Each structure stands twice: as structure tokens, then as C-alpha cells.
């Protein structure tokens, strides 16, 4: 089967070179197609009555409650616009606690009294939907018989048109809550967390005399992914069902030559990227960057910053679009954190900042950061946020897939710390010692080549090993996993920041109330903030063992796996803070904890069952046949009087590995029959018993692969999947 897939993949690539490039989608002008399939501000302004438009804009930009009286007007305009573009259906698109999106399509068609059909879509259908809430994860908040749930239109995220091969659907972003009002999704707490942060940030901005009225978080996620030939994908049951390879010996060449990163993009892959970008531009997703990543067949796409809620929707749309477009080019798109052992896995760097409604980035240091006290206040508050809530941030990116990646010299360590860089670290050290007098200047970089321009050099280097790094005018949360929604990492950051800003605002308000100037109040507060939280600052090599030891001395958490990380979400301090800022209540937090535990256990169990199946039905039968062939060859050579010394060694090695594979497969199968117990106990058993048994079984399978003749090995190999493009 492996050799058949190789033949088909090779033929497909050759055929692509002959005909595929000619039939690839023509490139459209981004400026002409951008947002053409979205019900955006421009469309709303043209199609809505003036009063309705202004009312809707107040809801979107100022978070004012939606006026129910405009719902029918907006719905009619939206329906007419969608039908003009060929839409026949609409859907309330939401993000339940599955980690992916959900949708149910309803037709615009309704029967008329004359026996004909008319298109209907009113305010009621726009504002509220009613999916079955019992069929989605609820963490015990809903029983099977408690099925009622509601979707509620989110006017801050523009609706768009999903164009399929045989029809078009109007997609309306919505929140998802239970009949009792509890959040069953990721959008609802994200919106709540943005409001919580805005409230606390505005307290500080008002002290500085700002005219702003709102603050929002902005973000831009860098999505890493793999592309492999679709023939290889369908020949690997582990990729189909688990998203990653559960067996696979390392190829002679991996990423050792460092020749993949920023390298030439293969023609077929580039055609795929062009098509994806075209589709995303049409629905208003501002993708900006594309390039090869470190591992072979690994790539990255990154957008321009947007408001966090819209960016989260757009990120899910990006992943869905990439999966949908890949088959057109004979490719499979893999978002798993570690689809291939021995080469880098994939992450999703979450670039995060705060901006007011006047367009000011609150994390922009300006030309003289040591004099920009408003920036220093917000930056120091982030020290407090990350130091105090490091466990929450670690939990927000925990998953079975990310366990394969974090701390493996390819991704940030599981220890949460902040990289500030030389310039900011120097300023904070000056402040702690009595006051900042200057800002480090990077100077000019002279390449020594007369025809090349002299370059302004940044005051500090970058640190790719840091999980949370300041990168000029934003923080980059680098530990986020490639396959997860960015919603909960955003929620965790927003709540942590809101709590820290609350503390800072309270201190500054008290000082100003006692007749101190804001400058004096800041001067007194900053040294204490820095001193109390400087342990979280680390500018060194996060991969080094020395850092783990140093982090332990500093008292930082080192939660190395998902099972250790998940309880952070139900710690009393976390519950109290989430409830204080009205983001999630105790019941909602415990539900997410239960769902995360169940997801971890189910994910690993699916992988383990697949490993046993593949060992018994794919590897073992062919290994036994090869063992028989070698045994017959040894007997024939011996009978002819030839030397069988080395052949006998090969036979013994194969026989030993076959026995080992069978024993280890049985051991893993027995581990899967373990009585569940509580969710916590089951998760710990899976981590401590099932995962090591999987590792042991894989070792035997991979060793057998290295001995088997290529034409008889049943699975596409790493060499084929990663390098045949």
C-alpha cells in the first residue's frame, strides 16, 4: 500500500507539472476582491437606512446594546445582499467547546399562500437560533434531556458568504449559550473578557487624561501547518484518524541542513497558497505573510492585526479554508502540533496587544520609552499579569498534541516567562534603582558593503525560545498550539491583564485622590511593580537545562504536561477572578475543566487504539512474511553450503522485534481496558501508563520499518511524505 501511494503521489506531481500549473486559479487583485463576500461596514452604509446604520455602528464600535427595532431592517438588507450573490441558505456559525466550529444551514425559502415560494429572513431569525445544546460538550452543565440552547448574533463580527461548488450560504457569526444562560462556547467569554479588560484599562487612561472611551485587545496569529500529498495521507490511517503519524522511522535527512526555512516555495504549494489567499481576501481576512517553516513540508501563514474577537473568527475561517482548498491541489493540510516525530512541530504564535478607540496602541513604547510613563505602566502591568497568572496561561495552551511539542528544543518551554529584550530590561532596571534616565540605542548596522544601505539596528535581539516575548509594540504568546482556537489563550490573557490593570488602577487612583500627580504616583508604583514581579523576566535560552533549574529557584511553575496544567483553571483564585470580572462563573469553569480532561483522555485513547490496530493489521502480518522469507533464504543458503552468519543475525533481529511488537501491542491493549474512575484519575493513568506504552510500541514498529524491504512496507515513509512535493 505504501509503494502504491508513492506511485500515485509521484504520478500526481509529474502530472501537476504538465497540466496543473496551467489550470491553477488566476490571481485576482487583492484590493478589488477584499471583503467582496462580507456584509461589512461599506455594505451596511449603502444598504441600511441612515438611522439603522448609525444604531448598528454604535453597537459595533461602542458596545451599546443592540436596538431590537432595527433587527428586521438589518435582516432584510442582509438577506437581499446575500441572495443577490447567489445565497440560498443561511447559518448561525458558532464555536462550541469542541474546539472547532459548528453550523446548521436553513433555507431562505418559505411557502406562500398561492403555493409558490418566497424568500424570508427576519430579525428573529437573524438575532436568535436554537441548536440542540445537548449534543455538544457541556462538562456536566446540560443533561441529555436538557437540549435547548440558543445562538445569538454577534454584530461585531461581519457575516460572510460561503461559496460552495453548488450553492452559497450566508454565514452569521454567533455566540452559543444554554437555556439557563451559561456559556457553551468560546466567543461569549471572549467578548466578556474584552469588556472586562476595557473597563480596567480605561480607569488608567482616564488618569492620564485620555479622550478614549474604549480599549480592545488586538491580535494576529501566525499559523504553522504541514502540506503532504493526498495519496500519502489516505494511505496512513493514523493521519486520517489522529492527525499525526503514530509510527514512522526518522529519514536520513530531516531539517539538519537548515535549508527549508524561508526557502523556495514549491510550485504546487505556492499555487495552493495563492488560492487560499484569494478565498480569504474575499471574506475579509487580511492575510499578509507566507513562507516555508523550519521542517520539510512545513509552512506558515500570518494575518495583519485585528480586534481579538474578529481575529479569532478569522483564524477559524483560515483553517477551514485551507483544509477545503488543499484537495484541489492533491494535498492534505495538517494542523496537528506534531504530525511527524524528529522534525519541528507546529505552533500558532499569538501576537497580542491593547488599543484604544482612537487608534493608539497602548504597548507602543515610542521613541523614548523611558519617558513614556503610560506605556511603562501598561507594560509593567503585564509583568504582574503573567507572573501572577502563569498557571492560567500555561493551562490555556494545554493539550495532548502540545505535550509533544513544548520544551522539546523546537518550541518554548512549559515554564511561562517574559522576554523583554535589552532595551526594556535596562529601563526597568533603571526604574527599580531610582528612575530611568535614558533608552538604549541600537545604533546603525554597517554591513561593510558600499552599495548596501546602512540599517537602523534595534536596541535588542529577538528570543525565539521565550513563551511570551515583547517584540517591539506587542507581546507574542508563542506557546499556543497550531490546532487550537486562539479564543481561550486570548481569554486567559485578557483576564490576567484585566486583573493586573485593576490592581494598578486602584493604586494610582488612591495616589491621585491623595493629591499626588499622576507622574509622582507612577514613579512610586513602578519600582514596586517591577521588584515584585521581576522573577518572571528571562531573556536567556529557554531550551537550556540551566533555565529549568533557575526557574525552580525563582519559584516559577514548570507544568510539563496537560494533566498537571488543567487544574489551574479551577483554582479558587482563578474562579474568584473570573467571576469578579464577569467572564465565566465557577460552574462554567469547572465544565471547561471536565471537557479538557475528557478531550485529553479520548484523544490519547483514539491514538492508542489506532497503534494497536496498525501493529496487528499492517505491520505484524508483513513483518511475519518477511521473517518467513529470510528464514527460507537462510535455509536455502545453508543447504547449498554457503555462509549464513549475517543472514542468521538478520533473522534473529527480525524475530526478536516481531516478538517485541506483539508483546508491546498486547500491553497497550490491556492498558486501554483500565477502569476509568474519576476524570482526573483516568487522565493521570493515561499519562503515566498509556502514553509510555505507546512510546514503547512505536519504538518496536519503527525499528521493524528500518529492516523491511521498501516495496513490502505497508505505509508511506517519512522520506516520501516530507520530501516528495
Q: Residue locations for each model-derived region?
A:
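A charged N-terminal "starter" segment
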Residues: 2-53
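Gly-rich Lys/Arg/Thr-decorated short loops/hinges at beta-loop-alpha junctions or inter-strand turns
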Residues: 29-40, 59-61, 181, 252-261
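Active-site core of metal-dependent hydrolases
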Residues: 32-148
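Hydrophobic/aromatic-rich, well-ordered segments within soluble, folded domains that form packed cores
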Residues: 87, 91-93, 312-328, 354-355, ...
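Short linear, low-complexity motifs centered on an aromatic residue
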Residues: 99-114, 131-134, 139, 236, ...
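Short, intrinsically disordered, low-complexity segments enriched in Ser/Thr and Pro
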Residues: 110-145, 258, 382, 505-514, ...
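Glycine-rich, acidic/polar active-site loops that bind/position phosphate-bearing ligands
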Residues: 148-335, 344-594
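C-terminal amphipathic alpha-helical interaction region
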Residues: 522, 526-725
Amino acid at each position: 500500500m505504501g509503494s502504491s501511494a508513492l506511485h500515485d503521489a509521484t504520478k500526481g506531481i509529474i502530472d501537476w507539472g504538465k497540466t496543473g500549473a496551467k489550470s491553477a486559479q488566476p490571481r485576482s487583485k487583492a484590493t478589488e476582491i477584499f471583503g467582496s463576500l462580507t456584509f461589512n461596514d461599506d455594505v451596511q452604509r449603502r444598504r441600511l437606512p441612515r438611522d439603522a446604520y448609525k444604531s448598528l455602528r454604535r453597537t459595533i464600535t461602542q458596545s451599546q446594546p443592540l436596538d431590537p427595532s432595527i433587527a428586521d431592517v438589518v435582516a432584510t438588507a442582509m438577506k437581499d445582499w446575500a441572495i443577490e450573490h447567489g445565497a440560498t441558505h443561511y447559518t448561525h456559525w458558532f464555536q462550541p467547546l469542541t474546539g472547532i466550529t459548528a453550523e446548521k444551514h436553513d433555507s431562505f425559502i418559505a411557502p406562500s399562500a398561492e403555493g409558490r415560494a418566497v424568500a424570508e429572513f427576519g430579525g428573529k431569525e437573524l438575532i436568535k437560533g436554537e441548536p440542540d445544546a445537548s449534543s455538544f460538550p457541556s462538562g456536566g452543565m446540560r443533561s441529555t434531556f436538557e437540549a435547548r440552547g440558543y445562538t445569538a448574533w454577534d454584530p461585531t463580527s461581519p457575516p460572510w458568504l460561503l461559496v460552495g461548488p453548488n450553492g452559497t450560504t450566508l454565514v452569521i457569526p454567533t455566540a452559543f449559550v444554554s437555556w439557563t444562560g451559561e456559556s457553551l462556547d468560546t466567543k461569549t467569554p471572549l467578548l466578556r473578557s474584552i469588556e472586562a479588560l476595557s473597563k480596567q484599562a480605561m480607569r488608567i487612561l482616564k488618569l492620564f487624561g485620555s479622550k478614549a472611551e474604549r480599549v480592545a485587545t488586538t491580535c494576529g496569529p501566525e499559523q504553522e501547518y504541514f502540506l503532504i500529498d493526498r495519496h500519502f495521507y489516505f494511505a496512513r490511517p493514523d493521519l486520517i484518524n489522529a492527525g499525526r503519524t503514530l509510527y514512522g522511522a526518522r529519514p536520513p535527512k530531516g531539517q539538519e541542513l537548515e535549508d527549508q526555512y524561508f526557502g523556495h516555495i514549491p510550485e504546487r504549494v505556492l499555487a495552493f497558497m495563492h488560492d487560499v489567499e484569494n478565498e480569504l481576501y474575499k471574506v475579509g481576512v487580511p492575510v499578509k505573510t507566507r513562507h516555508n517553516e523550519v521542517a520539510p513540508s512545513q509552512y506558515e501563514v500570518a494575518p495583519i492585526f485585528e480586534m481579538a474577537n474578529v481575529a479569532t473568527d478569522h483564524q477559524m475561517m483560515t483553517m477551514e479554508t485551507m483544509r477545503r482548498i488543499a484537495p484541489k491541489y492533491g494535498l492534505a493540510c495538517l494542523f496537528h502540533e506534531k504530525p511527524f516525530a524528529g522534525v519541528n512541530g507546529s505552533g500558532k504564535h499569538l501576537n497580542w496587544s491593547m488599543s484604544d478607540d482612537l487608534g493608539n496602541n497602548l504597548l507602543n513604547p515610542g521613541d523614548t520609552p523611558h519617558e513614556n510613563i503610560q506605556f511603562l505602566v501598561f507594560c509593567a502591568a503585564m509583568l504582574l499579569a503573567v507572573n501572577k497568572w502563569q498557571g492560567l496561561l500555561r493551562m490555556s495552551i494545554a493539550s495532548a498534541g502540545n505535550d509533544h511539542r513544548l520544551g522539546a528544543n523546537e518550541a518554548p518551554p512549559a515554564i511561562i516567562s517574559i522576554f523583554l529584550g535589552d532595551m526594556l530590561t535596562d529601563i526597568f532596571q533603571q526604574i527599580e534603582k531610582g528612575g530611568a534616565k535614558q533608552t538604549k540605542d541600537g545604533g546603525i548596522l554597517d554591513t561593510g558593503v558600499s552599495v548596501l544601505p546602512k540599517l537602523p539596528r534595534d536596541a535588542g535581539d529577538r528570543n525565539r525560545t521565550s513563551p511570551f516575548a515583547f517584540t517591539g509594540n506587542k507581546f507574542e504568546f508563542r506557546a499556543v498550539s497550531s490546532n487550537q482556537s486562539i479564543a481561550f489563550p486570548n481569554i486567559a490573557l485578557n483576564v490576567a491583564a484585566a486583573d493586573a490593570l485593576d490592581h494598578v488602577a486602584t493604586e494610582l487612583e488612591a495616589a491621585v485622590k491623595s493629591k499626588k500627580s499622576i507622574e509622582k504616583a507612577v514613579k512610586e508604583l513602578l519600582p514596586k511593580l517591577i521588584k515584585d514581579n521581576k522573577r518572571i523576566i528571562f531573556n536567556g535560552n529557554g531550551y537550556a537545562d540551566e533555565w529549568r533549574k533557575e526557574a525552580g529557584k525563582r519559584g516559577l511553575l514548570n507544568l510539563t504536561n496537560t494533566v498537571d496544567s488543567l487544574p489551574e483553571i479551577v483554582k479558587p483564585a482563578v474562579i474568584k477572578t473570573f467571576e469578579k470580572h464577569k467572564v465565566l462563573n465557577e460552574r462554567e469553569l469547572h465544565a471547561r475543566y471536565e471537557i479538557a480532561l475528557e478531550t485529553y483522555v479520548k484523544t490519547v485513547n483514539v491514538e492508542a487504539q489506532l497503534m494497536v490496530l496498525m501493529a496487528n493489521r499492517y505491520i505484524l502480518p508483513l513483518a511475519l512474511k518477511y521473517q518467513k522469507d529470510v528464514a527460507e533464504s537462510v535455509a536455502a543458503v545453508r543447504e547449498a553450503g554457503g555462509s549464513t552468519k549475517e543472514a542468521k543475525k538478520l533473522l534473529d533481529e527480525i524475530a526478536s522485534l516481531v516478538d517485541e511488537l506483539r508483546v508491546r501491542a498486547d500491553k497497550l491493549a490491556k492498558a486501554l481496558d483500565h477502569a476509568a474512575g474519576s476524570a482526573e484519575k483516568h487522565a493521570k493513568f493515561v499519562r503515566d501508563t498509556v502514553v509510555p506504552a505507546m512510546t514503547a510500541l512505536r519504538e518496536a514498529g519503527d525499528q521493524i520499518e528500518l529492516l523491511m524491504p521498501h516495496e513490502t512496507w505497508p505505509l508511506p515513509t517519512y522520506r516520501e511524505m516530507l520530501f516528495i512535493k
